[in-house]
């Protein structure tokens, strides 16, 4: 049994920062939603049909408010959310539009030969529906990660064909055997006379049982904000070197883990975001945690340049010596000049090979993050001019051709920070910590960040994530983070989600998932509206949690879900059954009927 105390004061401070940032963002020209909506008169629509359309698209039509009352979601909110998900309706749509959208939604799976992504628990036998033109024969097989495979057996499950856009479509049912091993596999379907089509088939653990939780041990640890742990030898903001030192101190004191804030990427232009819970990307790391002097190529710099770097560091420390606040901007401005010099130094043969391998593994996703970083530095803002707001625009591609060295520099920064941020967990393990670094996963990303810029089709334009009204915030909360569209995420094979989990787990022995309820449902609210105008959008939690477990199992990592707040009772039970630990506020844990702290048992 494992619980983590949550400092409420810090949480309150984080919400304050989010609200201030939101107001600043609304003043920019970079609106994510250019549509002009009209108000809907619910009396003019068949609400039963609209609610049905919402239901089959995973959009909540009602919820229980903080007072316990049953709240109905209005027509305007439902139509705006559905529109943002790619459903062909919007405020002002007619009943005929809604009926057409219902038909299109119900036809969609019949138009696909294979489901977008199939996620199955290991040991479960699952039906796989394959759709073909009526009367066509089809063969299905699977290929495992290791290259081996086998045929899938077709079951005798006749289903009446469906008329889809004037074409009769049939359904064949195949069986996915429960004997398949866990992993990211592929299923294939071959219709007579056509090229085979494929789709992801993921077999995930029923439950994770990390080796460190196999016995009766009880663990304790320390919670620290990495950026605040700044040493006299650093650059005014805590970095990987400082975090490794803190990790060593905690290990020597007998701690089993060190819980830190999210290490997701931030912008590298002036006006850097203070909150680590509003990153520009969750798939990449925060390069401000680099310690320049610890980069191997630093030692090859001419003495003059090393002296200049040390002088710049000392001057920075003198300027902020009497300050109680954390100065990210001046720290990074001084540090980045040093890193530019180090980047230009020749690398040894093996170091160059390692860097090239890192870039190759990063693929197009790393290329785009580096391009976005170079663009924002060139412009001096994350609010890019219109011609650069698309990763594939002509202007963006021209910039990429003309600034290849800057793009390579930002790839190099990611390589260096990934090396250095691996130190704290390595030190912890060497010195006897049972768990090591406990990483933290933020809920989402900045609307002007590289994740949204790189993959706009996966995000819901014109929507933000937040929380419904409650006793403390009767207008609700707006976290100003664009959400993923569930169906679009599935069409990618959940690749963006997999990247985020992998990035966090490669640096840690455990992972805390902030607002883990977001794997089940998220409160969406339209841009420009209060949170009270929102509704819940549901995700395929079996797929999301299953992928999370598969990545954790491969790293023998512990998972902790931050499950505070309004939670449906079955959710905590479900998480526990899958091996994900929960969170409690320490100060509120009392023996029943007393003011005594909860007993250790």
How should each PLM-predicted stretch be described?
Residues 16-31:
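Short, Lys/Arg-enriched N-terminal segments with co-localized hydrophobic residues
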Residues 35-88:
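Basic helix-extension-helix modules of the SAP/HeH family
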Residues 83-154, 158-190, 200-455:
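Acidic/aromatic-lined carbohydrate-recognition and catalytic surfaces
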Residues 264-265, 269-285, 518-539, 564:
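Aromatic- and carboxylate-enriched substrate-binding clefts and catalytic-loop regions
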Residues 288, 447-495:
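Active-site-adjacent "subsite" loops/lids of carbohydrate-active enzymes
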Residues 425, 429, 444, 448-470, ...:
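Active-site-proximal helices and loops of the catalytic beta/alpha 8
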Residues 427, 496-511:
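An active-site-proximal structural segment forming one wall of the substrate-binding cleft
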């Amino acid at each position: 049994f494992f619980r983590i105390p949550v400092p409420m004061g810090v949480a309150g401070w984080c919400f304050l920062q989010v609200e201030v940032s939101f107001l600043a963002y609304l003043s920019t020209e970079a609106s994510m939603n250019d549509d002009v909506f009209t108000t809907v008169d619910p009396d003019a629509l068949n609400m039963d049909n609209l609610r049905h359309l919402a239901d089959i698209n995973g959009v909540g039509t009602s919820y229980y408010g903080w007072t316990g009352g049953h709240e109905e979601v209005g027509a305007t909110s439902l139509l705006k959310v559905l529109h943002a998900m790619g459903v062909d309706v919007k405020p002002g749509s007619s009943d005929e539009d809604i009926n057409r959208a219902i038909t299109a939604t119900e036809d969609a799976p019949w138009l696909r030969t294979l489901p977008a992504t199939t996620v199955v628990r290991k040991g479960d036998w699952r039906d796989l529906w394959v759709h073909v033109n009526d009367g066509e024969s089809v063969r299905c097989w699977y290929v495992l990660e290791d290259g081996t495979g086998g045929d899938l057996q077709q079951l005798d499950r006749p289903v009446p064909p469906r008329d889809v856009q004037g074409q009769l479509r049939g359904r064949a049912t195949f069986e996915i055997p429960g004997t398949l091993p866990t992993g990211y596999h592929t299923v294939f379907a071959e219709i007579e006379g056509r090229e085979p089509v494929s789709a992801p088939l993921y077999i995930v653990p029923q439950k994770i049982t990390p080796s460190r939780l196999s016995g009766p041990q009880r663990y304790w640890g320390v919670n620290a904000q990495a950026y605040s742990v700044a040493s006299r030898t650093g650059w005014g903001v805590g970095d990987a070197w400082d975090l490794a030192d803190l990790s060593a101190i905690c290990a020597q004191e007998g701690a089993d883990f060190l819980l830190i804030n999210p290490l997701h990427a931030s912008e590298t232009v002036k006006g850097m975001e203070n909150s680590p819970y509003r990153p520009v990307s969750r798939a990449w790391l925060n390069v401000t945690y680099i310690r320049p002097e610890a980069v191997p190529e630093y030692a090859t710099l001419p003495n003059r340049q090393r002296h200049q770097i040390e002088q710049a560091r000392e001057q920075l420390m003198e300027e902020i010596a009497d300050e109680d606040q954390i100065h990210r901007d001046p720290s990074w401005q001084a540090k980045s000049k040093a890193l530019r010099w180090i980047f230009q130094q020749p690398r040894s043969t093996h170091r160059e090979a390692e860097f090239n391998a890192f870039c190759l593994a990063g693929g197009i996703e790393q290329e785009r993050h580096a391009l976005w970083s170079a663009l924002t530095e060139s412009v001096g803002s994350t609010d890019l001019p219109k011609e650069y707001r698309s990763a594939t625009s002509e202007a963006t591609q021209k910039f990429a051709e003309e600034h290849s060295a800057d793009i390579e520099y930002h790839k190099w920064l990611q390589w260096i920070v990934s090396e250095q941020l691996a130190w704290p967990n390595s030190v912890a393990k060497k010195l006897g910590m049972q768990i090591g670094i406990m990483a933290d996963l933020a809920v989402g990303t900045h609307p002007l960040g590289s994740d949204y810029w790189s993959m706009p089709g996966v995000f819901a334009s014109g929507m933000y994530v937040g929380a419904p009204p409650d006793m403390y915030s009767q207008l609700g909360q707006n976290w100003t983070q664009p959400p993923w569209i569930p169906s679009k995420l599935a069409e990618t094979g959940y690749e963006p989600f997999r990247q985020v989990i992998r990035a966090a787990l490669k640096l840690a022995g455990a992972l805390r998932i902030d607002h883990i309820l977001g794997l089940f449902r998220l409160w969406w609210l339209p841009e420009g509206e209060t949170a009270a105008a929102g509704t819940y959008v549901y995700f395929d939690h079996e797929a999301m949690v299953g992928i999370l477990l598969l990545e954790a199992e491969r790293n023998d990592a512990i998972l902790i879900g931050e499950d505070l707040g309004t939670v449906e009772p079955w959710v905590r039970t479900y998480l526990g059954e899958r091996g994900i630990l929960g969170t409690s506020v320490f100060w509120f844990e009392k023996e029943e009927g007393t003011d005594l702290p909860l007993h250790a048992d």
